[in-house]
Every structure is written in C-alpha cells, then in structure tokens.
Amino acid sequence: MNNKKTATNRKGMIPNRLNKFSIRKYSVGTASILVGTTLIFGLSGHEAKAAEHTNGELNQSKNETTAPSENKTTKKVDSRQLKDNTQTATADQPKVTMSDSATVKETSSNMQSPQNATANQSTTKTSNVTTNDKSSTTYSNETDKSNLTQAKDVSTTPKTTTIKPRTLNRMAVNTVAAPQQGTNVNDKVHFSNIDIAIDKGHVNQTTGKTEFWATSSDVLKLKANYTIDDSVKEGDTFTFKYGQYFRPGSVRLPSQTQNLYNAQGNIIAKGIYDSTTNTTTYTFTNYVDQYTNVRGSFEQVAFAKRKNATTDKTAYKMEVTLGNDTYSEEIIVDYGNKKAQPLISSTNYINNEDLSRNMTAYVNQPKNTYTKQTFVTNLTGYKFNPNAKNFKIYEVTDQNQFVDSFTPDTSKLKDVTDQFDVIYSNDNKTATVDLMKGQTSSNKQYIIQQVAYPDNSSTDNGKIDYTLDTDKTKYSWSNSYSNVNGSSTANGDQKKYNLGDYVWEDTNKDGKQDANEKGIKGVYVILKDSNGKELDRTTTDENGKYQFTGLSNGTYSVEFSTPAGYTPTTANVGTDDAVDSDGLTTTGVIKDADNMTLDSGFYKTPKYSLGDYVWYDSNKDGKQDSTEKGIKGVKVTLQNEKGEVIGTTETDENGKYRFDNLDSGKYKVIFEKPAGLTQTGTNTTEDDKDADGGEVDVTITDHDDFTLDNGYYEEETSDSDSDSDSDSDSDSDSDSDSDSDSDSDSDSDSDSDSDSDSDSDSDSDSDSDSDSDSDSDSDSDSDSDSDSDSDSDSDSDSDSDSDSDSDSDSDSDSDSDSDSDSDSDSDSDSDSDSDSDSDSDSDSDSDSDSDSDSDSDSDSDSDSDSDSDSDSDSDNDSDSDSDSDSDAGKHTPAKPMSTVKDQHKTAKALPETGSENNNSNNGTLFGGLFAALGSLLLFGRRKKQNK
C-alpha cells in the first residue's frame, strides 16, 4: 500500500523536477502537461511526462556522374509549427513541430518524400550534373507523454505541530507493517460518464476523422466520475482492467505504483499495476475510514499498447473495465513510420524504474546497396553500459519486421550482434559500429536496439544523436528530451531507502521505549515531503510497526494520529533518539541510509470521577453535620464544556452520587431540587463540607473531585400532635349473710354491731409540656382530661328472731371496709421547631372508676328454752387503685434563624371519690340492726303473753 518513490521525484508530477522528452524527426512536438485538480490516478512514482521529438536533415552533395538536374521541394506538413519560409501543403500524416535541426548529407537522384508527404524540392544534379544545393526534408515529429492523471470535483464528508529536523544515517532493522487484508469491492465503487478521448488529436483531411498520432504529442485520456459506498473499509480493493490495445502511461511505461489522490493530495487508494494482466489493483487507505460520501471524477493519461496496436492508420478497440463498469471506443492510431528513410529511430519506451531510454533504430528500410555503412551513436546526458550487453543488432529478413510501432518481435529477427564490434568511446557516451564488416557492398537491413542510462553528472536535458555514414549520404537522426511544466527527470540509478519505525504504549509515561512495553496497532501514519505534500499513508501493524519504502535522499515529515483512548507521551526525552518519542509530528532526513528512528509513544488516557453528596440540612447552616443524613433519589445531571448532557444519575439511599470515566476538562453539575425542600446556603465553609448550589462548574485536571455537594431543608410547614388517654376502672363488691335462729323461753339479749368503712382515694396528675421554636407562628395545644369515679356500696341486713323462755344472747358484728385508690398521671411533652407554623396538640384523658359494694345480711331466729348464742361477723374490704401515666412528646427540628413559641396547658385534676358517703352508710346499717333487735324483743313478749 505504500507509495513508492524513485530517486528524485514522485511517481507522479512533482514540481521543479525534470521530465524528459524525446525529440524525433526534424522537429519538437510540444507536450502540455495536465495539471490534476482534485483526484489523481496514476501519479505513481517518478514518472516523466515524456514526449518524443526526433530531428533529421538531409543534405545533397556532389556526385561524379552527370545527369539532368531536378528540383526537390521540401514541404512542411504543418505550416503553423514550422519557421521555414516554404510553400504549404497538406498531408494525412502526423504533424510536426520544429525544434533543433541536424544536418543530413545525401547524394541521390529523384528523391521522393515519404508517406505521401509533399516536400519542398530543391535542385538535385545527377549523372553528369553536379549540384551543391542543400535540401531538407521535414518528417513527422513524435511526442510521447507518460502517465498523467487530472482529477476533478472530489467531495467528502468527514466521518473525525512542531517539527524537529534531524539527520540520521544509522541502519535499522526493517519491519514492514502488515498490509491490511480486505475484499474486492468492485460492486461498491461506481463509475459513470466513462470516456476515452484523444488529446490533442489530429484530423485526417481525407477522411475527416480524428486520429491518435502517438509520435506527435498526442495522448489518450481516460475520464470518469465515481462514488464510493460508505461500507468500504481500509484494505478493500477494486480494479482497472485495460483491454488488448490500451494501457496506462505514455512513452514511459506505467509505473507499478498507481495511486489515487484527492484534491489536497491525500492518498485515497494505492494502486499496483500488473503489466502481465494489464490490470491495476487499488487498495483503499484509511482515508475511507475517516470520511463518508466520497465521490469525484478523474482523468488518467493512457497510451496505445504498442506491441498489439502495431500498424499506422488502423482503428483499434480501446477498452477498459473500471470496477464492474466497462467502456470501449475505437481509436485510429498512427506512429508516423517513414519507410523510405534509410535511418529512422524512435524511443521504444522509457523504463519507469531507472528512466533508461530503450531506443530502436531502423537502418536501410528502403533496402539500398551501400559500399560503406558506419553507424554511430552519440549520447548527451546519458551513458552506455557495456557490461549490460544490451546493445543488440538484428538482421531483418522480412520487410514486415519493420513494424510501424517501433516494437519489433525480436524473436523473429536474426541476432547478428556477435558479428560486429561495438566500439565505446568518450567515457561510454559514443558507440561506433562498422556494418560492412569487410564487405565490399551490401543492401542488408538492420534493426538496432540500445539502452541509454541517465548520466548523473550531466546538467543537460539530454539528447541522443544517430548518424549513418554511407558511401552516398550521411544521415543523421536525433532524439532529445526537454522540460515540461517544471518537472524533471529522475536519476534512475539512485538508491532507494526506507523510513519509519514504531508506535508504542508508554505505560510508565517516561517517554522512553522499555522492553516490557508493547506496540499499538491501528495508528494512522502519514508521510509528507518537505513542502507538506502527502506522499503516502499507512497504519501500524499488530506490533506497532510501520514503514515507508522506496524513498530518495531528502527531508520528510511524518504525522501520527492519536489513537482513541490514548494521550501522547512526553517527546524527546533523553539523548537516545532510537528509543524516545518524537511526538505527533516529526521530521526525518534520509541521507544514504534508512531512517528507522521515527517513533511515537502514547499512554492510556486516565479516567477520573466526580461527585459526592446531597444531604438534609436540618439546622439550615449550610454545613454537613454528623447528625444530618443524605437525601435519596435526587436527580443529578452532568454536562460537558459545550453544554451537552453526558450523564444523569440519582443519589442513593445515603445521598451519594458519582460520575466515572471522565477525561480532564470542564464540566457542569446540575442538582434537581427535590419537591417540598428548599436550597440551603452555599459556600459557607470548607469545599468538602459546604453546599455548592443547584449548578456547579468544575474543572478536572488529572484528579478526581468528590467535593460537589448540595443541601436542602424542609419547607415552611410543621405539625406536631400528641394524644394521651388513660382510663382506670375499679369495682369492689362484698356480700355478707349471717342467719341465726334461736327459740328459747329464756331471756334473749341481742347485740348487733355493724361497721362499714369505705375509703376511696383518687389522685390524677397531668403534666403537658409543649415547646415550639419557629421563625413564624407556633401553636401548641395540650389537653389533659382525668376522670376518676369511685363507688362503694355496703349493705348489711341482720334479722334476729328469738322466742324462748330462756336467756338468748345474739351478737352480730358486721364490718364492711371499701378502699378505692385511683391515681392517674398524664405527662404530654410536645416540642415543635419550624420556620412557619408549628401546631402541637397534646390531649390526655385519664378515667378512673372504682365501685365497692358490701352487702351484709344477718338473720337470727332463736326459739328455745335454752340459751342460744348467735354471732355473725361480716368484714368486707375493697381496695381499688388505678394509676394512669401518659407522656406524649414530638420534636420537630428546623433551620437557623427561626424563633420558637411554647404553650403549656395544665391538665384537668381528677375528682376525689369514695369518702363522702361513709357516715350515711354506717347509720343505715346500725339503724337496721336496732330495728331488728326491737322486733325480736316485741315478738318475745307476745309469745309470753300468749302462753
């Protein structure tokens, strides 16, 4: 995928360098260079935009024989391009442009201009006529252009330095980054408006058709628009397939590297041309991973494939398949071969790698008979290499072997090189061959092929001159090469070098490569020349290695992209350039050695966190107190510096929140106020203990920040209600029954003593304490109600009946004691503290009910003559104790600067019960006993009377 470079210029158009042109047949054809505007195909390494120009001139000399003189007229083919003041005529052959002329001396009679060209005839004496006039015949010019692509209208949509010069001569181990492996995506690269046009083109005056004159500055241009699907990835490929008669390039063979550029010179795809299949395979760079919606158009310089399209004035089908889109067009080709010329030559091709000129010369096409034939080649700016043994002489056995395209099939020729001696002289810049080789006469025909290599020491643009010195005429032919649009030829034999090295993860951030630190895969690396023009781009392999190859001596710039999640480490640490980091952009100098020291280190960008706490500020002081608790469920939003929301969360049950995986930078934290709460005071104390407010700006610089807090307190309503209810019930019931029956004739004495004692004690104590502290109104209401009822009932009934003649003694003693004690104690304490209204209501109700019932019944009946003694003793004791204690209290905290109001209401006292009716009960009891005794006495007297 790397864009290769030769010695001095890119495989494309590089400003201020020499591109050489071959000049042929008397004149120079001007070759215009197409300047790429946006997207460039085929600007592969160091291609000269070559046009071939050949010059020849024929001079007549004296002849010993005499004959009637004959005028020969040399006519120019294209009057617009010749400076000679000659008569104009038209010819259906390639036009010529005038350049440096060479003198050709020839003695002949009745000379005909080649290929229907009408020449300006000068006077020629033959036989007995002698002339000294010189005549010149103008032949076609041959201009060849090499690969040149003009690109247009590229549009893309983006998907997302200090230079330190140095010169390094050390050698390093070359580890080439592994190429991306992709798939063929011919179906995802779409071409439209495909066309093959002739530039400039020449119109045949006879047929009216435009022809491609391959040796007269014409080139072919392949044009098309295209779009690239967004699904295409780095490493994917697509192809250009050229047909049988059509190839990229010009006189100069297409380079192996054919790259695709955008308007800014960035490489979109790297192409490799295979001359065997006549196919270019393009591999996409990481450009397509960085941009979407890539579309544009291009123009690519192309040429007729000489080995197949061999014949002048013949239409050939020029066909090309771009991706999956095929286009073809028939083009008439003319190379301008002049079959009547004893000496004619052409640049067969220019080698793309070493820029050597591979020349072909046709000797004695007319099959003249000579007694002298000396073939001499003089090089200017070039040299022969005798050791290469590429100076070949072939004898032609079939006239058809002089093919018009100057690319004969040498396998069908007779190689007679060993029969001749090639004499090199002038520092291998001159080669001389005697084609007679001791023969007295010969009409043999030859095809001579040579290779001329650029001479590094020469400052001239270069020229190749041929002469064929015969016994009749001395023919000269010249091929020269000139500059075009500031381009220059490269020195093909200059050595190429490599540049690159390593991208690694600097885990300890020390700026140095350590043994345990590993490379980073997938980092984009871009190579630029000293003018900032992109030459190549690549991606680091799985070991972090990258390399650019095929580079000449010079200064280069290398740019590294920062991989996602990493930060560039410190650059230029220490003195060992081989193990330091050179930063994101660095400069490397190649001087007669590889430079494998351009490294860049990165460390994983640390991630940080921020957050802390949202709490309930019960005392409204704006400070976090140890007794104050967090608030759950508060929404917190995090924004970046652009105001974009990058995270939301809610506080947990402890009021805590946090945001993680944050880079250093500026952020904003926004707290959403909980319903019913009020923002507390801000920035009242240390940053980790205060409230920061509803929106907080924060900057993270290589550290976490857990000081972003906020506090709230409850809004202005507080209500405290305390109710206390105490109820006590006591019931005491005592029943006594005594029955005595005595019948006697004796005396009866009845004594009844009844004692009933009921004691009720009720004690109710209610204490209500309400404490309210508020900034506004506080209302505390405490109600205490204590009710104690005591009921003691003692009933004693004694009945004594005695009938006797004897004494009767009845003693009845009834004692009823009822004691009721009810104690109710209610304590209500309400404390309310609020900014607004505080209402404390304490209600205490204590009810004590004591009921004591004592019933004593004594019945004595005595009927006897004897003594009867009846004793009834009733004792009833009822004790009831009720104790109720109620305490109600509520404490409501509030914030600073509020006032407190206290209200206290006294509890109602419980009524005393159980003591007021004791005397009346005792009176009733004793009255009843006395009545009973009276009845017994009366009843006894009546019985005595009856008896």
From Swiss-Prot:
The gene is sdrC. It is a peptidoglycan-anchor. Residues 56-71, 84-155 have a biased composition (Polar residues). Residues 912-927 have a biased composition (Low complexity). Keywords: Calcium, Cell wall, Peptidoglycan-anchor, Repeat, Secreted, Signal. The keyword Secreted applies. Residues 72-83 have a biased composition (Basic and acidic residues). Residues 685-695, 712-886 have a biased composition (Acidic residues). A motif (LPXTG sorting signal) lies at residues 910-914. Cell surface-associated calcium-binding protein which plays an important role in adhesion and pathogenesis. Mediates interactions with components of the extracellular matrix such as host NRXN1 to promote bacterial adhesion. PANTHER family: TOL-PAL SYSTEM PROTEIN TOLA. Residues 914-947 form a propeptide. One of its GO terms (cellular component) is extracellular region. The modification Pentaglycyl murein peptidoglycan amidated threonine is found at residue 913. NCBIfam families: LPXTG_anchor, MSCRAMM_SdrC, YSIRK_signal. It comes from the Bacteria. Residues 1-50 form the signal peptide. It is found in: Secreted, Cell wall. This is Serine-aspartate repeat-containing protein C. It holds the Pfam family YSIRK_signal. Belongs to the serine-aspartate repeat-containing protein (SDr) family.
